[in-house]
């Protein structure tokens, strides 16, 4: 599997500090040769609330809230499907992807890709073009999100060396 993923690591973890915020995140991707389900996940930690991606496919994520009694801190939450906000023709792509033959990798089949975000991102981009406005995410934000993953992998390949995002990806 190493040649397929161009990585000697079956699992990669990135620890991220958000710009001008007390929020940090842990991103985990388990790819191969591990006794667990395939997983791409993000856990976000803040001083008031924290969000943890489900450990098992099909389970619900957990929202932790500070200043509660210990047993009440964690609560499973349902993440709503916002397909109804999309044009009818693409609503079905938020829960399961429809791809060509041979494209059955779990990153495609679990929720249409990244939790069903792909149709929302595509629709937002098209709507922004039609309205002649900047989309969300814009080019800088998209570069920030993409570079985060690239730099996380580079960091792993360099023994965990800290990597900083390039200036063109940071808020103006």
Label the predicted regions:
Residues 142-149:
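Conserved beta-strand->loop/alpha-helix structural units within folded catalytic cores of enzymes
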Residues 94, 99-110:
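A hydrophobic C-terminal alpha-helical subdomain
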Residues 125, 142, 159:
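Hydrophobic, well-ordered secondary-structure elements that form the walls
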Residues 1-81, 85, 109-111, 118-135, ...:
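Contiguous beta-strand/loop segments that form the cofactor/metal-binding neighborhood of enzyme cores
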